[in-house]
Amino acid sequence: MAAAYERGQHKLCSQRRLSSTRALSSCVASRSPLYEWHRAAGARFIEFGGWEMPLQYSGIVEEHLTVRQAVGLFDVSHMGKIFVEGPTAHTFLDHLSANDVPTSPGKARYTHLLREDGTILDDVIVTCLAPDRFLLVCNAGPRNAVWSWLKSHATADVVFLDRTLERLCLALQGPRAPELLQRFTSVDLSRVKLFAGVTIDFVPPAPWGARPRAVPPEIEGWGKSDLSGIAVPPARDPSVASGRASFLVTRTGYTGEAGFELFPTAAEGSWVWESLLQSGVDLGIKPIGLGARDTLRLEKGYLLSGQDFDGHQTPLEVNCAWVVKWGRPFIGRKALEAQRTRDDYPRLVGVRMEDRGIPRPGHRVLSRGVDVGHVTSGTMSPSLRVGIALASVDRGHAAPGTSLQIDVRGTPHAARVVPLPFL
């Protein structure tokens, strides 16, 4: 099954993969500071959101199961990292956000940035670093659109800093991720709750005794007031050669497993990456590519920007009504209220295959031969060993238990609507 699955994933990604020297030279794509490490490790690359990123190392199925069973390390530095600062930064972001933006330092929240017509510009995570300082993590593809959207609504006392190229985002994910990261810090990570975080001291298990280093100014002092009792490390000297670092860590991820996302500087990134991989050998750690990241998120029913929503859907249409906090003004609210009242919009549902068919994006969804929707994301689940999909279907065919068919290359395959997540 694994070999067939890999072939299917390769075919699916063939239009985007950078598979030749000529393709690489002609493509204007950003690269992570870890690019050379990935290349030396034998990674296969793909163009994603304007970035050349590793698709896989040892294989998508193996990497997927590593994260479910042990611990994996992802380079997701293509994610946009925009700091929003100023005395009215919270009011500004809250007006652009469908969900409440957190006010307590160290709290993070998943939300949608909406246009006036209620459609989703992007789904993002906003972390409060201080009452007047926030970090907005957006997707790579819409990053420029998000930046322009922020600037177009800016007020005089709000400042934006795009640190995407200056900071990495490393996702340490899996049931043994907390155990591994705890080896590097004196901060009690068991007290960092989901969608919260802290600035950690990052020191490899040995040797200690390095000089202090300075915390970058955009996160100076963050984490000291929101997580009572958690120790925050003293300032450090900026030299990576000292064997220490201090950076932002949030308990977030895109896999549904325990884990953290780390935001070291570009200068610190390779050292942090290699230190985690070396220290985690006994825990079964492996580097993980975007291929497994996609299958992991799909098993949990998480949305993929540009695929499950592409600029034409509202939160109500992608199973995210829970994101919307109606008791406050925000851009797009009136349009959403009107849509909610009409209740005539398509629904995004989970679909599980009942035979060996593998659903793929764009496949049509049928009910007794009548077209009722389409697949937005689909794959063979490495954990469940069955085809699964997210599909946009009309309201009358969205209830769990509804029998459907997926048209796979002209052949209808039996499927059924199931509750999310799949796993």
Residue spans of the language-model regions?
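N-terminal mitochondrial targeting presequence
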Residues: M1-C27
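Short beta-strand/turn micro-motifs at beta-sheet edges
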Residues: R68, D123-V124, V249-T250
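Short, charge-rich binding segments
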Residues: H95, P102-S104, H112-T119, I125-A130, ...
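Short, low-complexity, intrinsically disordered N-terminal modules
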Residues: M1-E6, H10, R213-V215, I219, ...
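Acidic, proline/glycine-enriched N-terminal capping motif
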Residues: L24-L114, T119-L121
